[in-house]
């Protein structure tokens, strides 16, 4: 009973995280919900960039790929290799999910450094990378949790829950908490790194000449790409773990 109560509190805490705010926000009222307008605007921009670039690159696919098509085929091959390494031979159905997570996070992270969001003035707050907001990272982490539960239940049925008493039933509470802390770690890791990177650049730009922060900005681009890779790798690893039943 205590384990169930603790798990319930963990889920409630994860939901409450969406109320965390850093700075001012512009709010939109959609139905009965109040949403952060900055996150929606920048997320739509990122999605438009992804859809537009893919459409332009592969609208006339060639047998021998060139330019944009060649680039996206390389990206697809990279994501397939990543999924196969972490999930195993049954990786195929999960490539679109892992690829979507990786590309959205990667472009979102880079948009914070490369796009001139600050030039767009809002009544309240300012635009920034979508992953700069905890709501976005939680929204990315929760489907990942659903995905690895779904993968395990689809592969093993109710026998999937047997992993919680392995290697001994004494570890039942810890094994349950482990699954509920995975989305927490995914969301906070991504949010914290992207927010910290943008704050460091803003502080340096305000304190020293423009040329000095440039190396830090390049480092930020590198770490932003690494964060996207880490998120996608962990998501694939969790799915593979739930299907194999080992840690």
UniProtKB/Swiss-Prot annotation:
**GO cellular component terms listed in the entry, alphabetical order:** chloroplast thylakoid membrane; plasma membrane; proton-transporting ATP synthase complex
Extract the Gene3D superfamilies matched here. ATP synthase, F0 complex, subunit A (1.20.120.220)
UniProtKB keywords: ATP synthesis, CF(0), Chloroplast, Hydrogen ion transport, Ion transport, Membrane, Plastid, Thylakoid, Transmembrane, Transmembrane helix, Transport
The record's PROSITE patterns line, in alphabetical order, gives: ATPASE_A
Q: What is its main location?
A: plastid
Give the GO molecular function terms: proton-transporting ATP synthase activity, rotational mechanism
Region forming the signal peptide? none
Residue spans crossing the bilayer? 38-58, 95-115, 134-154, 199-219, 220-240
Q: Does the keyword Transmembrane apply?
A: yes
- Bilayer topology annotation: Multi-pass membrane protein
Q: Where in the cell is it found?
A: Plastid, Chloroplast thylakoid membrane
Q: What does this protein do?
A: Key component of the proton channel; it plays a direct role in the translocation of protons across the membrane.
Which family is it part of? Answer: Belongs to the ATPase A chain family.
Subunit structure of this chain's protein: F-type ATPases have 2 components, CF(1) - the catalytic core - and CF(0) - the membrane proton channel. CF(1) has five subunits: alpha(3), beta(3), gamma(1), delta(1), epsilon(1). CF(0) has four main subunits: a, b, b' and c.
This chain's protein is named ATP synthase subunit a, chloroplastic
Q: What is the organism of origin for this protein?
A: Acorus calamus
């Amino acid at each position: 009973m205590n384990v169930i109560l603790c798990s319930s509190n963990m889920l409630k805490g994860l939901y409450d995280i969406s109320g965390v705010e850093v700075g001012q926000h512009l709010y939109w009222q959609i139905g009965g919900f109040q949403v952060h307008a900055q996150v929606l605007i920048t997320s739509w921009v990122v999605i438009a960039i992804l859809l537009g670039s893919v459409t332009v690159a592969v609208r006339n696919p060639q047998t021998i790929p060139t330019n944009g098509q060649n680039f996206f085929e390389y990206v697809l091959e990279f994501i397939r290799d990543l999924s196969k390494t972490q999930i195993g031979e049954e990786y195929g159905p999960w490539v679109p999910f892992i690829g979507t997570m990786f590309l959205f996070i990667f472009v979102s992270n880079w948009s914070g450094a490369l796009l001139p969001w600050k030039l767009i003035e809002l009544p309240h707050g300012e635009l920034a990378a979508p992953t700069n907001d905890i709501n976005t990272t939680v929204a990315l982490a929760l489907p990942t949790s659903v995905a690895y539960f779904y993968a395990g239940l689809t592969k093993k049925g109710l026998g999937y829950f047997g992993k919680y008493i392995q290697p001994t039933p004494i570890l039942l509470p810890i094994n349950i908490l482990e699954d509920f802390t995975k989305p927490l770690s995914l969301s906070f890791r991504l949010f914290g790194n992207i927010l910290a990177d943008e704050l460091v650049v803003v502080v340096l730009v305000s304190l020293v000449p423009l040329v000095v922060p440039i190396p830090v900005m390049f480092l930020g681009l590198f770490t932003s790409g690494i964060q996207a890779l880490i998120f996608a790798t962990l998501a694939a690893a969790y799915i593979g773990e739930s299907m194999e039943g080992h840690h």
